[in-house]
Structures are given as structure tokens and as C-alpha cells.
Design a protein with these regions (language model features):
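PLP-dependent amino-acid enzyme catalytic core
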Residues: 1-332
């Protein structure tokens, strides 16, 4: 039985968010690929968030957040600038939105971050700073810089980010036949919380299943414990879900509305990247394939069903792509 959660926005707010996002790009496709159905033994609808202008779902949240906060920060009614931390897609999202609304954006990334994602953030206009050994360290540095430079710190999880991201869940759930289960990647939680909220807003019986990396299990541990559990490391090639300090509000919503959290290995995620390329002719980044990895882990229980997976992004580096397509799993 599906457990309902408190929906953080109204239908009217979701419609307005969809209108705003629609000023920048149209709905992304959702397709039921026949080769993928043959491979899984179920009807599988893929939500192609790799088809947004930034190649990932987070641009939706960036647009809604920036539009809502562009007049928040100073006495003269203008934002001095936004700052945040990212492994890539959140930063591209804010850089894209900042350019759209005329707001300067500073992004902090950890050392060793994807060169291609760094280049994309700079191309969208971000002032990029490299600091810290991982995402959490970069986030702490961004918070300090926000105070030092009088910038508005954009969190990785916020109700307005969830509202923006919910526009893709709305497209999927209204555009596909009713799904038994939707598998969603979980980093800081905006995607899974958005799917839970839209499912409940539409009164559907779809299970929402979050997928995380075995080597970044903080959300899975938090879900099992019923409260936030941090980890010391999140060393996974699936960089978009490399979270070691979950957001408390996100965990509360996930506990209230998700059916379960599935942990997958880097090796299974690499298999999922290759399978998506072979069956859909799309190339996901690892976090864009991790939802399929979750489905692969539960393939036996989904036989003959109708499921959705979120291909959350396609921003993969060339060297990583070459290694995965050669049949390997990149080392971290």
C-alpha cells in the first residue's frame, strides 16, 4: 500500500512552475523502449532528463529557485549573487538560471571534479572555485564564502528546487500509463521528493523507489534508521549520488513517501550505462543510469510489470565513457 506524504506545493504552484520551465525548453520525452523491455522482462518507461539544455534534470529546480529568489537578498531588491556547491549538474543548473535572470553565480566544486562538467559550468557563466576533497567539503567552503562575500547560499535541497524538479515528474506521470514503480536516483533528494509529491498530488498508487550507491549509503542508512545518518566517505564513481551528509527535510519526506531505498554497486551501474546505450541509443552519466541499476537489482520482482526509470543526466566525461564502454568499472 502506498503511504501518502504531506505535499509541499499545490497543483496551481506546480502548473506555474511548469509554465516557467516551459519558457526555456519543452517537455522532455518519456519512451517505453522495446529492447529495454526485452532485457528486463517488463514495460520500462525512461524519462529522458538528459535532453534538457544542461543535459540533466536539475535545471528545472535552478530556474524556479532563481526566479523566486532573484529579489530576496538586498535592501535595493536585487540579489548580489548566488553561490553553491556541486559535483556538476546543480552547478550547471544555477549557472544557466543565473544567466537567464541576470544574477552572478559562483560554484564550488571538489578537487578532482569532472573536467567536462567544470567546463560546462564555466560556459554557462559560473565563477568556478575548486576546494575540498569531496562534495561535503566543497559545500562547507561555499557556505563560508557566502558569508565572506555577502552572497546568497543556494542549498542542494530546498522546497523551490523540489518544485522545479517536480515538473518532470508531472510530465512522466501524466504522459505515461500509470506505473507500478518509479526508480529515482537519490543524491541530496530533490528528485525522489519531487516524484513522491507529484504521485501524491495526482492520487496515484505508484511506488517511488530511491536508488543510491553502495559506496555512498547515507540516504539508505538514514531511511532504515528513521533519522539522518551521516557517513565519513562517499567514494563512488556515481558522482551525482555521492552524498555523505543528507538533508534532514529530504530524509523526512523520503521516509514518509518512498517505498524503499535500493543500494547498487558501481559495477552494476556500469552495466546499466552499457544497457541504456544498447537499448535506447542514449548515453547516460553514471547517476543517469543508477535508476536502471536499481531496477536491475529488483528485476525478478518487476517481471511483467510497468515501471519508470529516470535518466537524470547525460553529462559523462570522455575517459569515463571510454572505460565503461570497454567493459570496465572506473576506479574512484
Amino acid at each position: 500500500m502506498v503511504v501518502r506524504s504531506a505535499v509541499p506545493f499545490t497543483v496551481a504552484e506546480l502548473d506555474r512552475a511548469a509554465e516557467l520551465v516551459g519558457q526555456f525548453f519543452g517537455p522532455t520525452p518519456q519512451y517505453a523502449w522495446p529492447l529495454l523491455a526485452e532485457a528486463i522482462g517488463a514495460e520500462v518507461w525512461v524519462k529522458h532528463e538528459n535532453h534538457t539544455p544542461t543535459g540533466a534534470f536539475k535545471v528545472r529546480g535552478g530556474l524556479v529557485y532563481t526566479q523566486r529568489h532573484v529579489h530576496d537578498s538586498t535592501a535595493d531588491g536585487t540579489v548580489r549573487g548566488l553561490i553553491s556547491a556541486t559535483r556538476g549538474n546543480h552547478g550547471q543548473s544555477l549557472a544557466y538560471a543565473g544567466r537567464a535572470f541576470g544574477v552572478p553565480v559562483t560554484i564550488v566544486v571538489p578537487h578532482g571534479n569532472s573536467p567536462d562538467k567544470n567546463a560546462a559550468m564555466r560556459a554557462f557563466g559560473a565563477d568556478l572555485i575548486e576546494e575540498g576533497r569531496d562534495f561535503q567539503a566543497a559545500r562547507e567552503h561555499a557556505g563560508a564564502l557566502a558569508v565572506e562575500r555577502d552572497l546568497q547560499m543556494v542549498p542542494s535541497f530546498h522546497p523551490d528546487l523540489v518544485l522545479g524538479v517536480a515538473t518532470y515528474a508531472r510530465e512522466l506521470m501524466l504522459g505515461a500509463p500509470e506505473l507500478d514503480t518509479v526508480y529515482v536516483p537519490v543524491g541530496m533528494g530533490s528528485g525522489v521528493c519531487a516524484n513522491i509529491a507529484v504521485r501524491d498530488l495526482l492520487g496515484l498508487d505508484t511506488e517511488i523507489v530511491g536508488v543510491v550507491a553502495e559506496r555512498a549509503p547515507a540516504t539508505a542508512l538514514s531511511f532504515a534508521a528513521g533519522h539522518v545518518v551521516n557517513t565519513d566517505t562517499a567514494d563512488t564513481m556515481i558522482d551525482g549520488v555521492a552524498c555523505r551528509a543528507p538533508d534532514a527535510a529530504a530524509i523526512e519526506a523520503i521516509i514518509a513517501g518512498a517505498a524503499r531505498i535500493v543500494q547498487v554497486s558501481d559495477e552494476l551501474c556500469a552495466d546499466a550505462v552499457r544497457m541504456l546505450f544498447a537499448t535506447t541509443h542514449n548515453m547516460p552519466e553514471p547517476s543517469g543510469a543508477v535508476a536502471l541499476a536499481g531496477l536491475l537489482a529488483e528485476r525478478d520482482q518487476q517481471q511483467g510489470g510497468r515501471v519508470g526509470i529516470v535518466m537524470s543526466g547525460g553529462n559523462i566525461d570522455g575517459p569515463m565513457l571510454a572505460e565503461i564502454m570497454a567493459g570496465n568499472t572506473p576506479a574512484v
